[in-house]
Design a protein with these regions (language model features):
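Active-site neighborhoods and metal-handling regions in enzymes and metal-associated proteins
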Residues: 1-463
């Protein structure tokens, strides 16, 4: 947690952005895995963390705009809880830690919300993503759980996005620390990547490194020699010579700030032939994004410039042909890069994705595309100092997609399918770093950059 002044300042800033009514921010509850007392590792709602600070289940906060007051709701523990869990701070104590003087039992939340509704006041809430909170909102507001998400306050969503998008110095420091853990995770994976090792073993080591810092991974670890599957959580394979291992993994600090990095390395520690060729193309794409990323530029334009680097590189390999700009405009490159360049990052690894990418990654100026590949770009809007985003180009050879496009004669003016056929067993490469937008451009987050050049990767893998 940060100091109480941080949370007071954030709630006041939110109050200033919402015209009237009350703002309801629900925390999360424990989620049973297979019976009530055996729960998944608890993860608090990120907006509740941002405005109310506490990573404990079963709480809610209310910001009353006209009254200028904040309320904290939760239940104190009883003796049975103390026997099993030990002494716990009271709700009043938790509220005071984040600068709130008025705390109430959770049962009184319905009275406060009901009174506001009876007075004709607006009750602002964010889109719920957990079913228990959908049901709670039905109980509080009378809106059916099945449709309550449609009634989330757009005014509140936009206000929260405005505040959470620009990271404070204390947040940047936490992200840097999360990236330091990410450095340990990824360099461990590089050292362990050898023929005969099971993917699951390495993935388990990475998860253990994150846990050893009192935190957890920021998402389910992706570690596979089948990098052509973008989010491959199957760790069942034995690493084979001649393949490449893609590791997309991140850590989450005890404060819940995240890291998210991807590296792709050769099994056995030495890039060979076409591995080196494709890797250098992806690295050039990655470096192009770093070169031009700065405040004021739209990230969709950065994405498209990176795609031009990809097309030129694939032309040089004989896999693509024709005019580079026309190929990108047509979307022919999406055969190899069917996702976007990056996304926001912070308290969520895909920051604020629960609020809707239409508000987080886009705005009234920049709207999402419907073109295949470009439609998957999560972040297109104009960049501002203080944003933390990912830079994650890739190049994938997806057999099913290649077969489909070839059969449908897709983009034959730009794609050399005969040459592409020879790469169907290649897999995929992705390289990802977390980037802070600064006043002058951008910088990597974390103390040290994870090895990324061919020389750096081969050196650490063969130490």
């Amino acid at each position: 947690m940060f100091d109480s002044a941080t949370y007071q300042r954030r709630r006041q800033a939110l109050r200033n952005k919402v015209q009237n009514g009350i703002i309801l921010i629900l925390g999360n509850n424990e989620a049973p895995a297979n019976y009530p007392d055996n729960t998944y590792k608890f993860r608090q709602d990120s907006s509740f963390l941002y405005f109310f600070g506490h990573s404990h289940p079963g709480y809610a906060g209310v910001i009353d705009i006209e009254a200028g007051e904040d309320y904290f709701f939760g239940n104190d523990v009883d003796m049975d809880d103390i026997i099993w869990m030990g002494p716990q701070p009271s709700v009043k104590e938790l509220a005071a830690q984040v600068g709130i003087q008025k705390s109430f039992p959770f049962s009184q939340l319905k009275e406060v919300v009901g009174k506001a509704i009876a007075q004709g006041r607006k009750v602002h809430f964010l889109p719920p993503y957990r079913f228990d909170n959908m049901m709670l909102l039905e109980d509080l507001t009378g809106i059916r759980a099945a449709i309550v998400k449609k009634y989330a306050s757009v005014e509140l969503i936009k206000a929260v996005v405005d505040l959470r998008s620009v990271k404070e110095a204390c947040e940047i420091a936490e992200i840097d620390l999360a990236c330091n853990i990410g450095y340990e995770m990824h360099t461990a994976a590089m050292r362990l990547c050898k023929p005969g090792i099971k993917e699951q073993y390495i993935a388990g080591v990475l998860d253990g490194i994150a846990a050893s810092y009192g935190s957890m991974t920021s998402f389910a670890t992706i570690l596979t020699q089948h990098g052509e599957t973008l989010h491959n959580h199957d760790h069942s394979h034995i690493l084979e010579p001649g393949r490449m291992m893609l590791t997309d993994a991140g850590a989450e600090r005890v404060t819940n700030y995240c890291s998210d990095h991807t590296r792709t390395v050769p099994v056995g520690g030495k890039f060979e032939g076409r591995q080196k060729d494709v890797y250098n193309i992806v690295l050039a794409c990655h470096d192009k994004a770093l070169e031009i990323t700065r405040p004021g530029i739209t990230y969709i334009s950065v994405h498209l410039e990176v795609c031009k680097v990809l097309v030129q590189g694939l032309k040089d390999l004989g896999l693509m042909k024709g005019n580079v700009e026309e190929a990108v405009a047509a979307g022919a490159h999406a055969l190899f890069l069917p996702h976007g360049l990056g996304h926001m990052m912070g308290l969520d690894v895909h920051d604020m994705e629960d609020l809707g990418q239409i508000y987080v990654g886009y705005d009234d100026e920049i709207r999402p595309s419907s073109q295949f590949g470009l439609a998957s770009l999560r972040m297109g809007r104009r960049l501002q100092e203080g944003f933390v985003i990912t830079d994650e180009p890739g190049c994938y050879f997806i057999p099913a997609l290649i077969d489909k496009w070839k059969a449908e004669k897709m983009h034959t003016d730009f794609l050399n399918f005969d040459a592409i056929e020879k790469f169907k067993d290649f897999g995929g490469i992705r390289l990802e770093d977390d980037i802070l937008i600064t006043s002058e451009g951008s910088r990597f987050t974390g103390e040290k950059r994870i090895p990324i050049t061919i020389e750096e990767v081969e050196t650490i893998m063969n130490e």
